[in-house]
Amino acid sequence: MRLATDQLGRPPQRVAVLSVHTSPLAQPGTGDAGGMNVYVLQSALHMARRGVEVEIFTRATTSADPPVVRVAPGVLVRNVVAGPFEGLDKYDLPTQLCAFTAGVLRAEATHEPGYYDIVHSHYWLSGQVGWLARDRWAVPLVHTAHTLAAVKNAALAEGDSPEPPLRAVGEQQVVDEADRLIVNTELEAEQLVSLHNADPSRIDVVHPGVDLDTFTPGDQAAARAALGLDPRETVVAFVGRIQPLKAPDILLRAAAKLPDVRVLVAGGPSGSGLAAPDNLVALADELGISERVTFLPPQSREDLVRVYRAADLVAVPSYSESFGLVAVEAQACGTPVVAAAVGGLPVAVRDGVTGALVDGHDVGDWAHTIDSLLSRGPATMRRAAVEHAATFSWAHTVDDLLASYGRAISDYRDRHPHADETLSRRTARRFSRRRGVRA
């Protein structure tokens, strides 16, 4: 359940956020960029508006990445050089964690000792770095997994690659070491307990948010005109990374059974989908529906609004989804959602009220559910969709994040009453080294 605001201990003044494998500045829908990127950036921006300074550490991926990007007052992104810019994918990054950690520690050394109040790591790779930073800086570590290897491997799409064993080992270490664990839903909390023996008292449920100022209902005809779509067509959209996990092929196969439906796909290949980036286009040809499928590249937030508004339905057929930010964004635009009944999607979508949930990935079931929603008239769900999405504001998310941070700081001080003394000794050593004398 959500944290009450009266559970908030001393709020942090400065937060170090770790996002090793993907930059919050990357375009969602490309490479490894997705909902996590949105979460990291938007939570930082909204915390900064409350006077909390946030520094986000991520791995530089091109030589053109500046060392520091000031995104907004109170929000910095530090691009840490760790390994070659080209030729590394997410599964190679464990070999670069030492280099990344060194870059983080060097950046921290430019500040006065005790600069950060807390470390928040996102994804298990960042958790490995956060574990060391926590011990070096004598501050608590809060960790958000976003996805778990065991959960993904239990629901693999056909032809998808399983997560390697080393990831499960790394995740277990971070779960054991983190001072608090933040999850998107109650189900994810249960999975941490059952799969990783996490202490339930250290877990906080914090739902991701949606930008309710950007994602709003609007004129469908205007949105379709901007995208070159026929205003008379029935449109079902898919938004996200093109990879087996996200299952866009399920939507195409279902659409092949629905001759009056146009499919709109917005996103780029990612993960194992990079091995055959044109597979989805080839599938549309094979199914004989290529004339009814429109492919768009990954969209900016402003352009994404048009996609949601243009659609009669948005489909989220993922095999695994810790929350499903696309589903909430679509509903905020007044568009009902048909989604797989997996992970956090039953929280993001109210079955029968703001859309529909489908058990499993049988193409016939998906076609039937889409047809039923379209026959019922998606417009009847629009108001409920907007009202439901309004409960997922970033303001609510940051309320709960800061409450979790406050509790982490309070608990850490209780468990480590001499943390300030430890920090003072390290401070003395640091200044002594700078002066060239022994402490």
UniProtKB/Swiss-Prot annotation:
Transmembrane segments: none
GO BP terms: mycothiol biosynthetic process
EC number annotated for this UniProt entry: 2.4.1.250
Name used for this protein in its record: D-inositol 3-phosphate glycosyltransferase
Binding site for 1D-myo-inositol 3-phosphate: 21, 32-37, 90, 123, 147, 167
Similarity-based family: Belongs to the glycosyltransferase group 1 family. MshA subfamily.
InterPro entries assigned: Glyco_trans_1 (IPR001296), Glyco_trans_4-like_N (IPR028098), Mycothiol_biosynthesis_MshA (IPR017814)
One example GO MF annotation: magnesium ion binding
Organism: Mycobacterium sp. (strain JLS)
Pfam families: Glyco_trans_4_4 (PF13579), Glycos_transf_1 (PF00534)
Function of the protein: Catalyzes the transfer of a N-acetyl-glucosamine moiety to 1D-myo-inositol 3-phosphate to produce 1D-myo-inositol 2-acetamido-2-deoxy-glucopyranoside 3-phosphate in the mycothiol biosynthesis pathway.
Cross-referenced CDD domains: GT4_sucrose_synthase
Catalytic reactions on record: 1D-myo-inositol 3-phosphate + UDP-N-acetyl-alpha-D-glucosamine = 1D-myo-inositol 2-acetamido-2-deoxy-alpha-D-glucopyranoside 3-phosphate + UDP + H(+)
Domain of life: Bacteria
Keywords assigned by UniProt, alphabetized: Glycosyltransferase, Magnesium, Metal-binding, Transferase
Presence of keyword Manganese: no
This protein's record includes keyword Transferase: yes
Residues reported to bind UDP-N-acetyl-alpha-D-glucosamine: 27-28, 35, 241, 246, 299, 321, 329
Binding residues annotated for Mg(2+), in chain numbering: 308-309, 311, 335
Subunit structure: Homodimer.
